[in-house]
Regions:
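His-Asp-centered catalytic microenvironments across diverse enzyme cores
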Residues: 4, 86-153
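Residue-level signal for well-ordered alpha-helical scaffold segments within enzymatic catalytic domains
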Residues: 32-36, 70, 74, 110, ...
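Active-site neighborhood of thiol-dependent amide/isopeptide-bond enzymes
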Residues: 43-103, 107
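Secondary-structure boundary elements
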Residues: 1-56
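A general marker of short, structured functional hotspots
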Residues: 27-29, 64, 96, 117
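Functionally constrained cores in energy, signaling, and assembly domains
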Residues: 1, 16-20, 68, 110-116
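A generic structural micro-environment signature
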Residues: 15, 44-46, 59-60, 129-134, ...
Length: 153
């Protein structure tokens, strides 16, 4: 799944010049790319290769996490994944009624940790692109305080 040697993934890394940047700028650039350039949406399956997520141009927690990890590993940033089951009610409103109705009661949710400056950091806020998050906040009329936005130094 983490097919970071895929030519399209390698071309993206070269185009963005991530390997030329220091580790922090590399991490930040990859994070922002996955968050904002890969839109929020449901792929055909959770078990698809990172290159397929890149080709689709969209993903959700599990598939965006796959792409995020592939890009990190290709750029020599250690990472790992965690996951657990959540009740589908937590995703109500984030998926169409048809998808929600047909989804299993328990859904697998994952997030990625990166190793930076001798510590592991949990990074999960890349799931919703900024445009989708803004619309969701507006439509649900909820405070922005409820959503963590990664503050880069």
């Amino acid at each position: 799944m983490l097919d970071f040697l895929n030519p399209n993934i390698q071309k993206l890394i070269e185009k963005r010049r991530w390997k030329e940047q220091n580790k922090f700028e590399r991490l930040k650039g990859i994070y922002k790319f996955v968050r904002d350039d890969i839109l929020f949406g449901y792929n055909v399956d959770d078990n698809i290769a990172a290159s397929k997520v890149l080709e689709d141009g969209y993903g959700q927690c599990n598939t965006k996490g796959t792409l995020f990890m592939a890009l990190l590993r290709a750029c020599e940033i250690p990472c790992r994944i965690h996951g657990f089951m959540i009740n589908k009610q937590l995703q109500k409103g984030a998926m169409s009624r048809f998808v929600y109705k047909n989804a299993p009661q328990k859904i697998f949710h994952s997030w990625v940790e990166v190793y930076f400056e001798d510590k592991w950091y949990e990074l999960e806020a890349f799931i919703l692109d900024r445009k989708y998050l803004s619309k969701l906040q507006k439509n649900l009329q909820i405070a922005t305080d409820f959503f963590v936005v990664m503050a880069w130094r």
